A protein has these predicted regions:
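Iron-sulfur-associated redox domains of electron-transfer enzymes in respiratory
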Residues: 2-158
Length: 158
């Protein structure tokens, strides 16, 4: 990957000033590293408010219900928390009625398990209540595991 720098002269013409490769100083850098990456997402969309209430990807699914910001706070989020799960992202502080949407998803699909990832911040405190309420309404014995993330990106599992 190279960045090209162009400049416009007084007469309106342009000339290339040079190029710069911001990655050349990194050890073991290879453009192939980026080309070989593909998404492991089992579905799209991943935002809770956008997903349908009934879908084949929910059948016997291991759900990951995570706060929007959690993936950015934990460097190993994909490898340690979301791999092999159906991700549903939401923000308990700003999203619509999360509990109602989850109640419908849980009631209409056979959910195998739920992993909750939330930040240890005031804005995420209601997240567990929404999920437990939805699971209770669905009357299904869904195992729920909770992981709290701290801003320092240290994760602690309850």
């Amino acid at each position: 990957m190279q960045m090209l720098y162009w400049a416009q002269n007084d007469s309106g013409g342009t000339a290339m000033l040079g190029s710069f490769n911001p990655w050349k100083h990194y050890d073991n850098y290879s453009e192939q590293m980026f080309e070989d990456k593909t998404s492991d997402l089992p579905q799209w969309p991943i935002k809770l408010w956008q997903v349908p209430e009934v879908s084949p990807y929910f059948h016997h699914a291991h759900l990951l219900i995570a706060a929007d910001c959690s993936a950015f706070a934990c460097p190993s989020f994909h490898e340690k928390l979301s791999k092999g799960k159906v991700p549903l992202l939401c923000c308990p502080a700003t999203d619509f009625d999360i509990a109602t949407k989850l109640e419908k998803i849980f009631s209409h699909n056979e959910i195998a398990s739920i992993t909750v990832v939330k930040m240890e911040k005031a804005c995420c405190q209601d997240m567990l209540e929404f999920i437990f309420r939805a699971a209770k309404v669905s009357r299904l014995p869904i195992p729920i595991q909770v992981t709290n993330l701290f801003v320092e990106a240290e994760d602690v599992t309850e």
